[in-house]
């Protein structure tokens, strides 16, 4: 029996197939490769995720992802840095890189 389903939409993807969307050596080509390989698993749309990290690291990854042009790419999921600084609630996010949410900081991370 064959079953046809719509493609899956993954809302949080840190990387795929050994390609980390937060890695310092991320390139548009590598990000595109990860997205293309994900399609083979049934994921047809996704949000590559940026984790809490230093401003420079975060902004560099955002700049790379912003240049990706692939049908699976639906935008960027920002996992931090706007999370609780409290132990427990903060989870694995590095305390040093957690910042209070502000429109100015949000805009700076996108340029």
Model features per residue range: what roles?
Residues 14-20, 32-61, 72-84, 111:
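Divalent metal-dependent hydrolysis catalytic cores, especially in the metallo-beta-lactamase
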Residues 3-25:
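Di-metal (Zn2+ and/or Mg2+/Mn2+) metal-binding site signature of metallo-dependent hydrolases
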Residues 27-35, 99-106:
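Short, acidic/polar
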Residues 24-26, 87-88:
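Short capping/connector residues at structural and topological boundaries
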Residues 63-111:
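Metal-coordinating catalytic core of metallo-dependent amide/deamination hydrolases
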Residues 23, 50, 95-98:
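Pocket-edge positions in alpha/beta enzyme catalytic cores
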Residues 1, 9-12, 69, 74:
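N-terminal hydrophobic or amphipathic segments with adjacent small-residue motifs
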